[in-house]
Regions:
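Flexible loop/hinge segments at secondary-structure junctions
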Residues: 2-169
Length: 169
């Protein structure tokens, strides 16, 4: 199999248990949801995982069955001097504006309003994102589009998007 990286730790456990019970090994390549979808459509793997659900026509065209396996959460991580784990609060609107490049510094009034007791530094914000075909990217960008109509119209939601800035990897 091949596909999403977020499910990989769970699949490792399942594969080990399956091998114990059956003596058969499961080979799974954590290459991203986009890669998994391409491989299942090309019939080069027996199963694939994607954080982005396939459309009905994709399922029918490729004679696939789709079902949920796990629930995955996406948590933005902030690393700032003097800020402790769990001390920073960001909401969807602020997060979307950070990724749109409209909020550029950590001491922006919108971030300060959510964190009135936190001493926010006058530092530039550097966003990081995935640049491969990622179901996590789809879910993250889909959320940003739901909380900010501008994100929805300018960027949209997909496994790969044209990020307005930041560092991809």
């Amino acid at each position: 199999g091949a596909g999403g990286t977020a499910i990989y730790p769970v699949l490792q456990i399942w594969a080990a248990k399956y091998a114990q019970k059956t003596g058969s090994r499961v080979n799974y390549q954590a290459i991203g949801s986009g890669g998994g979808i391409k491989q299942i459509e090309a019939k080069t793997v027996d199963f694939a995982n994607s954080d982005k659900p396939l459309m009905h026509d994709e399922i029918a065209k490729n004679n696939l069955v789709q079902f949920p396996q796990v629930v995955i959460s996406i948590v933005p991580v902030v690393h700032l001097p003097g800020i402790s784990a769990g001390q920073m609060v960001l909401n969807g609107d602020v997060l979307s504006k950070i990724y749109l490049g409209q909020i550029k510094k950590w001491n922006d009034p919108a971030i300060k309003a959510l964190n009135p007791k936190v001493n926010l530094p006058n530092m530039a914000i550097l966003t990081v994102h995935r640049s491969d075909g990622s179901g996590t990217t789809f879910n993250f960008t889909n959320y940003l589009g739901k909380v900010n109509p501008e994100w929805h119209s300018k960027i949209g939601a997909d496994t790969t998007v044209s990020w307005p800035g930041g560092v991809g990897g």
